[in-house]
A protein has these predicted regions:
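Outer-membrane beta-barrel transmembrane domain signature
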Residues: 72, 76-94, 228-337, 346-349
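Outer-membrane beta-barrel "beta-signal"
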Residues: 188-190, 372-386
Length: 386
């Protein structure tokens, strides 16, 4: 878990910047941070309980699955003899599909936060695949911002058809890459709740705010995704598509929807450090979105000399508008300073484009590429506020 050390270093830095004085009182830097993270005065204290900002630590366990599917359609020249013995050159359709589908697996992680700020990292447990997730998020009553980096390694299964069934040169082949393919994504999610007075979006997920009574709010959301799929250029499947071993996408989406907090039970604390606090909450969030910026690029590599593969061409295209969505469900229970949270979320995107690349000194025919990525996660969080 190589990301653990940067995270611990960050926590240590925050601790250094927010020291207590000799009498155990908060220092100037700590008081400044508290002021920045102070809740809005617009919050209704009869609807939302806001405890004083404190350090939190949590361990997480994930049940998750990631999958990626890509198809590429193009044509290649092929030769055959006519009944009269004449050599005929014709265009033969080729269909290639690649599937990087991970098995249902588990992951473990840690979260460290202060007030509305939180840093987290997780890594999968066992299995042939390798997954790392690192995220930073800020969640308050009216705002939420999450920045997440995701990396996934797993062998790629592929299927190729050359020509049409019944043709003399028809081929139908399956295979798997010798080296794992890689998926990487950088995601930025931002949400705004219009009902910032009586609704706390983060109440079911973090335990930094507590909803006293049921409430909902219309939401505005935005999503930025930078995604990458790549395989080793030495793989045979890369040569089938003129050396295309890397595809990337950049997408920006905007949308709106509704989020609702159902509070079956709440009891206010009666002593310091939230002693006596009891809270049970369920959150449902759904936001349809429109992806208005959708850029796709494909990169070709060629073995120029001595087994060293070098980028020889790159093609960038802008895609069409498409519909996306954000869906999330969370359940949280708090007992004094301890909290248990169960949540489920999805992260998906799709792309398509037609690329024409120069490969091996020849200009390739147009390669139509379509890809889709889907990752769902169910997370159990056990946290404590200090």
């Amino acid at each position: 878990m190589r990301h653990l050390f940067p995270a611990l270093a960050l926590v240590a830095t925050l601790s250094f910047l927010c020291p207590a004085d000799a009498q155990g009182q908060k220092g100037p830097s700590h008081r400044l941070l508290d002021k920045i993270l102070a809740p809005s005065r617009a919050l209704d204290p009869n609807a939302i309980y806001v405890p004083a900002p404190r350090w939190t630590f949590a361990v997480t366990g994930d049940l998750r699955q990631a999958s990626f599917f890509q198809t590429q359609d193009f044509s290649l020249p092929s030769a055959k003899l006519s009944p009269s013995g004449e050599l005929i050159i014709q265009e033969t359709p080729v269909h290639l599909s690649a599937n990087l589908r991970g098995k249902l697996g588990t992951a473990a992680g840690v979260q460290v936060g202060y007030g509305d700020l939180c840093f987290s990292l997780s890594k999968n447990l066992g299995g042939e695949d390798t997954e790392h997730v690192f995220s930073f998020d800020y969640q308050s009553a009216g705002y939420a911002l999450q920045v997440q980096y995701f990396s996934y390694l797993n062998p790629v299964n592929y299927h190729q058809t050359f020509g049409e069934e019944g043709d003399w040169a028809y081929r139908d082949e399956d295979g798997m890459t010798e080296k794992p393919g890689q998926l990487r994504s950088f995601l930025v999610d931002a949400f705004y709740a219009f009902n910032r007075r009586t609704f706390a979006y983060s109440a079911a997920y973090r335990g930094n705010l507590f909803q006293k009574r049921s409430a909902g709010s219309w939401m505005f959301g935005s999503k930025v995704i930078l995604g990458e799929y790549r395989i080793d250029p030495e793989e045979e499947v890369a040569h089938w598509v003129n050396g295309q071993a890397r595809q990337t996408t950049a997408q920006v989406s905007l949308g709106g929807g509704y989020s609702y907090n159902l509070v079956p039970f709440h009891r206010q604390p009666y002593a310091e450090r939230d002693k006596g606090l009891r809270n049970l909450i369920i959150n449902l969030t759904f936001l349809p979105m429109v992806t208005f910026f959708n850029q796709f690029s494909s990169t070709a590599y060629n073995d120029l000399e001595n087994g060293v593969y070098t980028r020889v061409d790159k093609d960038v295209r802008n895609g069409k508008l498409q519909v996306n969505y954000v869906a999330r469900i969370g359940i949280g229970y708090t007992y004094n300073q301890f909290s248990v949270n169960l949540s489920a979320s999805n992260n998906d995107y799709s792309y398509q484009g037609i690329s024409s690349l120069t490969y091996g000194g020849f200009s390739s025919d147009a390669v139509e590429t379509k890809g889709s990525f889907f990752r769902w996660t169910t997370t159990l969080r056990l946290g404590m506020r200090f």
